[in-house]
From Swiss-Prot:
Name of the gene encoding the protein in the UniProt record: rpmE2
One annotated Gene Ontology cellular component of this protein: ribosome
GO annotation, biological process: translation
Lineage, uppermost ranks: Bacteria, Bacillati, Bacillota, Bacilli, Lactobacillales
Organism for this UniProt entry: Enterococcus faecalis (strain ATCC 700802 / V583)
HAMAP family tied to this protein: Ribosomal_bL31_2 (MF_00502)
Protein name: Large ribosomal subunit protein bL31B
GO molecular function: structural constituent of ribosome
Amino acid sequence: MKQDIHPNYQPVVFMDSTTGFKFLSGSTKGSSETVEWEDGNTYPLLRVEVTSDSHPFYTGRQKFTQADGRVDRFNKKYGLKDENANPDA
């Protein structure tokens, strides 16, 4: 392996800019901003827009939409009703 060609891998604190949630992880990305972590050490701080704390998929606020199939689109396009559909169900 060649010497001095690999990026510096270090512990970094990532902070969600929308919720303020922070977590410590390893990264090759650095920053001039620093923050003191719970263990008393100072680490570079990287601000990110979305984390598992704010993403709708992980928070349960995501809305699922049912995509219409080909038959449904055809029926909607030509104004046809499904006679087999049970409106009471």
